[in-house]
Curated annotation (Swiss-Prot):
Keywords: Cell membrane, Membrane, Transmembrane, Transmembrane helix
Pro residues: bias regions: 24-39, 50-70
Residue ranges crossing the lipid bilayer per the database entry: 96-116, 153-173, 205-225, 273-293
Organism: Mycobacterium tuberculosis (strain CDC 1551 / Oshkosh)
Region (Disordered) residue spans: 1-75
Protein name: Uncharacterized protein MT2637
GO CC terms of this entry: plasma membrane
Keyword Calcium among UniProt keywords: no
Topology relative to the membrane: Multi-pass membrane protein
Annotated compartments: Cell membrane
């Protein structure tokens, strides 16, 4: 039995014939949709009834910025303690006098407050002198000092003055170091004009109170809270956040970057200890460097930025690079 002749075209085509490039689809059929994940060729339009294909998985519009004043877990901090030390030393060498003079002035002020308080307490206290003579005939005296109510009041006021001065110094040094991190020109006076001083005072009181309460709970909770709240004052100075929000932001920042926070804290402690070993004169260098490390760490871990360290210019007579024709 003979087979019927085949029609030209694709045997699988139920309509037969050649569906060339210029032909139209038969009635009842629309243009085939584009393959998944691809759009129409450039310069063409999609047929009616079809919308633009969705973007491939993993793509889409960029996410919006995080709320101001708070870090985000999805943001890479890019923090390195080596970079923090290098950047801080570079910035210190470029602003040495501007950084050292305020630290020296604050140290003199602290010594004056401590000395005045101690002197007044001793002067207002009752002293009793007792003389002793041993069996060998050698005489000696002992002085017993009993604090009076007036001396107690002076000591209390001295502690308040010392606490306020320490917070003022902390805020002033942070203000200057934050301006350095922003690339702004700074002077000695910059470190004596702290920003958001009221927020800083309340934030400091909150930290001291919560640390004291934690210290009553077997000491360790107080130490832990003091560590995780280390950036609270920086948030108050830099972003004008409320005391509670500053503490929350610091806890979140440290909690999401424990390793970097610990390494930075150790680097700051080392800078101060080395300064103490150099007969305390080295603290005029150690304290500013530690403050710069603190600011660098705060900015990087909280999603902020710092102006990169300026490299020294090449020496005079440096050969030029290759010239293009």
């Amino acid at each position: 039995m003979s087979q019927p002749p085949e029609h030209p075209g694709n045997p699988a085509d139920p309509q037969g014939g050649n569906q060339g490039a210029g032909s139209y689809p038969p009635p009842g059929y629309g243009a085939p949709p584009p393959p998944p994940g691809y759009g129409x060729p450039p310069g063409t339009y999609l047929p009616p009834g079809y919308n633009a294909p969705p973007p491939p998985p993993g793509y889409g519009p960029p996410p919006g910025p995080p709320p101001p004043g708070y870090p985000t877990h999805l943001q890479s901090s890019g923090f390195s303690v080596g970079d923090a030390i290098s950047w801080s030393w570079n910035r210190f060498t470029q602003n040495a006098v501007t950084l050292v003079v305020p630290v020296l002035a604050y140290a003199v002020a602290l010594a004056a407050v401590i000395g005045a308080t101690a002197g007044l307490v001793v002067a207002l206290s009752d002293r009793a002198t007792t003389a002793y003579t041993n069996t060998s005939g050698v005489s000696s005296e002992s002085v017993d000092i009993t604090m009076t109510p007036a001396a107690g009041i002076v000591m209390f006021l001295g502690y308040i003055a010392l606490f306020a001065l320490v917070l003022y110094m902390h805020a002033g040094i942070l203000t200057g170091c934050l301006d350095i991190a922003d690339g702004k020109p700074v002077t000695i006076a910059t470190f004596f004009r702290p920003r958001n001083l009221g927020l800083v005072l309340v934030t400091g009181l909150l930290i001291v109170a919560l640390t004291f309460i934690g210290g009553l709970l077997c000491v360790i909770p107080g130490l832990i809270f003091g560590f995780v709240a280390q950036f609270a004052v920086a948030f108050a100075v830099d972003r004008s956040t409320s005391p509670i929000d500053s503490v929350k932001a610091s806890i979140e920042t440290v909690g999401s970057n424990i390793g970097g926070s610990v390494l930075s804290w150790l680097a700051q402690l080392t800078a101060v200890l080395v300064g103490e070993l150099l007969c305390f004169v080295g603290m005029l260098i150690g304290i500013p460097v530690a403050a710069l490390i603190h600011v660098y760490t705060y900015r990087k871990l909280s999603g902020g930025q710092v102006v990169e360290a300026v490299r020294p210019a090449p020496p005079v007579g440096w050969p030029p690079g290759p010239q293009l024709a």
